[in-house]
Amino acid sequence: MPNAVIDIPAASAPEAEAHFAASFRFETDCWDVHDTLSRPDAGFVLLDVRGPDLFAKGHVPGAINLPHGKIIASRLAAWPADTVFVTYCAGPHCNGAARGALRLARLSRPVKIMTGGVTGWIDEGFVLDSGQPGA
């Protein structure tokens, strides 16, 4: 009987290791972002790539609002070229974080996505900020 889970064989252990190890170069999670933001120098810039209205309703504390469609070289000039950016959007149902990350990568900027976005942040029990910091 066909089985959607195992009809396609699992990757070999070395292939799986390489795949999952590489994934950490592209993404981080809400817990790690929260933990790192509690330190004096987080070492990255957190970008909320949603629109300003959604940002104003609630965003991750310390995030800067820069909608993914407005990520251009001149908006990034304030940060050194080796600055790591972490993008997030509404959640797993939203591709805004990937759109923002793609724009940053095309501008030769190091970037990761915060998986889960706002939904993941809330699911972890973290609080959103409704202040108005911005770029």
Please describe what each predicted stretch is:
Residues 1-57, 132-135:
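Flexible, polar/low-complexity N-terminal or interdomain linker segments that lie immediately upstream
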Residues 55-61, 121:
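Short loop/helix-cap segments at secondary-structure boundaries that form the rim of catalytic
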Residues 37, 72-81, 135:
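Short amphipathic alpha-helix with an adjacent loop that forms part of the alpha/beta core around
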Residues 63-70, 108-114:
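Short hydrophobic/aromatic-enriched beta-strand-loop microsegments
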Residues 40-46, 61-62, 84, 110:
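Short active-site oxyanion
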Residues 64, 82, 128-132:
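Short, hinge-like loop/turn segments at secondary-structure boundaries
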Residues 76-122:
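Catalytic cysteine-centered active loop of the rhodanese-like fold, especially the PTP/DSP P-loop
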Residues 42-43, 71, 82-83, 119, ...:
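Hydrophobic/basic alpha-helical segments enriched in Actinobacteria
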